[in-house]
Amino acid sequence: MKKPHLILFFILNFSLAISSQIVIKGKILDENNKPLTGANILAFPTNNGKLAHNVSDNLGNYTLSLTKNTTYNTSISFMGFITRKEILNNTKKDSIINFILKEDPNKLEEIVIKYKIPVRIRKDTTTYNTDAFTNGKERKLKQVLKKLPGVEVDRKGNVTVKGKKVTTLLVDNKKFFTGDTKLAVNNIPADVIDKIDVIEDYHENAFMKGLEKSDEIAMNISLKEDKKKFVFGDIEAGLGIKNRYVLHPAIFKYSPKTNYSFIGDFNNTNRKSFTLRDYINFDGGLDMNNLKEVIQSPVVKLLRNQNFTASKHKFGGYNMQHAKNEKLSISSFLIALSDKTNSRVENFRNYLIDNITERLREDERNNQNLFLGKIQFLYKPEENTRIKYYTKFEKTSINQTIENNRDLANSIINFNENNLINSDKINSYLKAEKKFSTYHTSQAIVNFNFNKIDDSTNWLTNTNIFPNNIPINEKESINVLKKSSTEKFEYNVALKHFWILDNVNHLYFNVGNNFEQNKFKSNLQQDNTTFSNFSNNLEHNQFTIFTSILYKKLIGDAIFTAELKYQNYYRTSLDLNNNSSYQSNLLLPKIEMDWDITNRKKLIFKYNLTNTFPSTRQLISNNILNNYNNIYTGNTDLKETFYHFVSLSYRNYKTYGWSFYPSIYYKIRNNQVQNIFNTSTIFNIINPINIDTPNKSLTTNFRVVYNYKYWKATVLTEYTNSNYATFINNNKIKSNNNSFLTRASFRTVYDNKPNIDFSYSQTHKDNTNSLFSAISNLSNLDVAVDYEYKNWKFKTEYLYNFYKNNATKNTNSFNELNASIFYQKENSPWGFELLGTNIGNNISKLNSTLSSNLFSERRTLVFPRTFVVKAIYKL
């Protein structure tokens, strides 16, 4: 670090803060000296000091961090026991104090108390009363969540509770936009929040709980009563050097029947309100069945790039939720995005077969427009019947221009590439659920999807840059155009019945089918001449019938699940008078053991066998020009790929103290669809086949967390190994990739002292095949400091990474300093902020990749230094 005295200052400050604290710990027991798990203990300071709270673990242990020389009124409570009150006078040193609670002879269902308990745990719901943890200076939900015990928020807005990721965010029990946490934590004002509920094993439908397993964790934000009938929110506006501007309104109106939300973002800085993750969440998230389709989506390819040198970003999101009556509710949202960005990438490539080097500079301009929407109806005619219907739609338009400057073996070539993409998607979904009795519940799902993509790429060059087997007409100006069109219609029907045999045995039956109709057309032409061997007109249909039986058994505190699925698959392909068909019958087993050792310890074992089928493009019989130097040829004989997946994970969580999260994952891919490379100098002809060599990958990680009342420390180690094979010019190439990651982080959450958020990681990669070996190291340092002094808030962030590639001896260091100063007078609706990003004005980042036939180093230019002055008005 350039200024080590700053770190010394914070270390000294932290040491002084620790020295002013003492620790009281012990056990909470009943009259038979048996531990009480989940008992609440609160310590209220009578003068200066901070309220302390803890919940006893499965052994009855508790820990309180108290301010030295302060008297506390202590309350210890547990459901069904008499609340005990104690006074701790002038606490001066660490002590061990045990508390014994007497059983309440009245056995009340609820203990009536005069104060709000900061944290209340009831089965799978944890409730935080936020006033007990905040000081009123927090601006957004994000700052509130950081102060709650067991809750973490990263820089991107991801929220985890007790080490598990929050997947759905609700406001007053209604989903906020798509349910993703990022929009909520960065936009909902802190002063409207009354309490926060964290719901594990979350289900939209209450009577399905206990039947369908849910890995979802929901966070419900309850608003204060005086905020439910008024408009609230804030508006940010700012100007900066080099004509920078920022306008960010976030306006909300909530009422008992109808809620409205609007979030806008208009700027030409490096700030993005809608990212790749937001789009994937809108599209239903990632799973094995749609992973390939999502990754290859044109929208994903552009949203994935977050490094640009210029940007004009326009974003608007509108959300409405209306309860027409007790039976029918309607919700909808619209999201509009317009992005114009410029970026530059410099590539150094080593083609391993011929040991030829290439330098390629790409100057890219993107104009992207995206419109997303959803309308949903939820109908509950009676308590045990629920019908949900929604329609989602998406319209995308992308115009991309790339100027390429290429140095191949000291030969300079310049050419341009223009891409036009238009995409339309519609998805309709209907789910009906009926509980007939305590023992029988049924579910029916019908799903329709339609997707159309029109894609064209135009290469303009003065030199023939294309593979030799394309009969290019050599002339002064070469114009090559590729057009493709993809249409997909799909419907899914599934019927499921849940049969509860008794309290410990469940039996579930599932039957359904899936139909896909895919049409793909493509051609390649120079001027008005079409190359016949690059014309494709494929109609690909596939029909799947499946049925499964699932047995679930409760064994002590563990749930054992075994499922056997039968799948019949049939496809037909017709492409330019070439007919082919394929049929398979499969049995796919699945086993899971979910053991709740205690309410804080959990062990999960999973094994399942799944499969994926080849995509439409992989089944074409002619060629596609993927890129100017890359030809793809399909294979009509491809079969399915099988995935054996085994995992074992353990969680031992404590609100304060040590928490452990070890896990191991192993995956084997058999009969994998793998690309065969036939290379000629730098040109690749790629053909997919099913290979008999398994693709194996192993990942182990171990995360250790230590939680203290005012700080948290985390250490993570992760190792990944993958072994796979490809074919280059009919030669099998085996690759072995190893990756080692170590990360340490430290974060404080003091009220009236500087807070530090520190993270350091070291990544070592060892990628080897028979042609090349690449060893690289990447170090990342991230330090953020924020401090509140009266009406001022100071915040700074320093990022540093150092990259070294031992194969090329190349090194690169990158550092970025961001800072802000915020001022808001107490009880004033106005706030002002000076914000600076990339203050050191660093230029680029560097990384490398290795494939079976290519080693590449990629230097990416980053957004330049920016200063903006903002005014914020709170409604």
Task: Kindly give the residue locations of the regions a language model identified.
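Membrane-proximal, glycine/serine-rich, low-complexity loop/turn segments characteristic
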Residues: Q21, N33, L59-N61, I82-D94, ...
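A short, solvent-exposed loop/turn motif at the edges and junctions
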Residues: A43-K50, T71, S75-I87
